[in-house]
């Protein structure tokens, strides 16, 4: 089932997405999010996560950086904490906030 879903997502990216234009308010895009979710969490859970993400992606959504939970990108977006303090704050680094402009 996983290869079929990945193939359908690839077909969407190649055949339909160029004609529909970029409308996603999130980074990674919803189709990239769906691909990552299926790869990292399997067909059933990944499909559910992708469906929930599609429901969050609408014209009134704030958008922004929203990686798939449990992936390497998510780990860098949400640093581990130690004794209630961020590892980055403990090392003297300023927190990084990513804001994307609204289209």
UniProtKB/Swiss-Prot annotation:
Its main location: membrane. GO terms for cellular component: plasma membrane. The keyword Cell inner membrane applies. Keywords: Cell inner membrane, Cell membrane, Membrane. InterPro entries: Membr_insert_effic_factor_YidD. It is found in: Cell inner membrane. It is a peripheral membrane protein. The keyword Transport does not apply. Residues 68-91 are annotated as: Disordered. NCBIfam families: membrane protein insertion efficiency factor YidD. PANTHER family: MEMBRANE PROTEIN INSERTION EFFICIENCY FACTOR-RELATED. Could be involved in insertion of integral membrane proteins into the membrane. Belongs to the UPF0161 family. This is Putative membrane protein insertion efficiency factor.
């Amino acid at each position: 089932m996983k290869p079929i879903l990945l193939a359908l997502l690839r077909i969407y990216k190649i055949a339909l997405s160029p004609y529909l234009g970029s409308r996603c308010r999130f980074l990674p895009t919803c189709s990239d999010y769906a691909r990552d979710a299926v790869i990292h969490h399997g067909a059933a859970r990944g499909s559910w996560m992708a469906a929930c993400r599609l429901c969050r992606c609408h014209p009134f959504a704030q958008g922004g950086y929203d990686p798939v939970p449990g992936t390497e990108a998510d780990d860098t977006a949400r640093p581990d904490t130690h004794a209630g303090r961020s590892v980055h704050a403990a090392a003297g680094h300023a927190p990084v906030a990513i804001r994307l402009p609204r289209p």
